[in-house]
Amino acid sequence: AASDVYKRQSLNQAGALVHVYTDGSVRLNHGGTEMGQGLFTKVAQVVSECFNIPIDYVHISGTNTDEVPNTSATAASSGSDINGMAAWKAASVIKKRMLKQASKVFQKSPSSIEFRNGLILSGNKSMTFKELAFSCWENRVSLSSTGFYKTPKISWDQEKFKGSPYFYFTWGAAVSEAIIDIDTGESRILRADIIQDCGSSLNPLIDKGQIEGGFVQGIGWLTCEELYFNPEGKLLTLGPSTYKIPGSRDVPPEFNIKLLENAPNEEKTIFRSKAVGEPPLLLAISHFLALKNAISMASETSNADLLNAPATPSKILAAVYNDHSM
C-alpha cells in the first residue's frame, strides 16, 4: 500500500469466489476493479496456475458486491497482491477436494497425483480436468469456495505516528536524456532507461506496460500538468483544452525497460511478486533532473535552482536566463 489511507488495516483485505463447473470451466469473481491495468488477467493467471489448466478455462465476471461483498478500493497498487491471494486461497480449497476425489478414482494417494496442463495424472493413469470435475459433481463434492486474504505484518498508530504500514517496498532506477530549446523553453525527453523491481513478475508484459504508463504519467506531472487559478481562487485549468496532459510525442523515442531478474519478493506475496502500478511514476524525476542539468549547461549564467515542477517552457526560460521575474 502506497498512500496514507492504506495505513488503515481495514483496507488491506480482499475476498474471492471460485466455481468449477462440470464442463471443466472455472468462474472467478473477486473484489478488484479492472481499469485497464491488467488485474483481471493476472488474477485469472493465479487461478489457472493453481489448477494447472489453460487460462482459457477461467472466466472472470465483473466485480459485483452481490458475489464478493465489502470490497476494498483497488488503489495504492494493491490489487494483484490482495485479490490474487484471495483467489489462490479459494481455488486451493477446491483443488484439495478434487485431489481427494481423484485419489478415489485412481485408487492412489493424493501425493502421487499431479495436475498438469488440464490433465490429472497418476502413474500411467490420467483423466481430464473436465472429467474430474464431473466425477466430483457425481459424488457430491462441492466445487465452490470463497477465499479471503488480509495483508500480514502491517500496523499503524496515527497518534503515536509509529508502526509498520507497508508489507514490503518496491525499488526502481531510471536514467533519462533530455534536450531543451533555449529560445523557446520547449523540452523533449530523448531516452529513458528503467530497471524496475517487480519481484517474480506475475506477467512481465503487463508489468512493462504499467511501467511505461506510470513513467509517462510522471513526465506529465513534472513537465506540463500545471494548475492556474484566477485572483478569486477559481481553477482555470478545467479540462483538456486548458490542462495540458502528456501525449504520444512525450513518450521517449528510445524507451528501454528491464525487470530486475532473480529477485523474488522476500515476503510471501502471491508468487513472490511485487506491486508495479504507481512506483514507476516517481522514476520520471530522472527526466526532471535531466532538464535541470541541461539548464546548467545552457550558459554560465543559467540558474537551474529556479526550476520548479512542472517544468513548463516559461519556467525553463526563466531558469536559463536566471530571470526571477518570469
Identify the function of each model-found stretch.
Residues 1-9:
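Conserved small/polar residues in nucleotide/adenosyl-binding loops
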Residues 42:
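Flexible, small-/acidic-enriched active-site or ligand-binding loops
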Residues 22-29, 268-274:
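Glycine/charged-rich beta-loop-alpha catalytic/anionic-binding loops adjacent to active sites
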Residues 25-31, 190, 205:
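Structural motif
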Residues 9-14, 20, 171, 251:
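Short, flexible loop/turn motifs enriched in small residues
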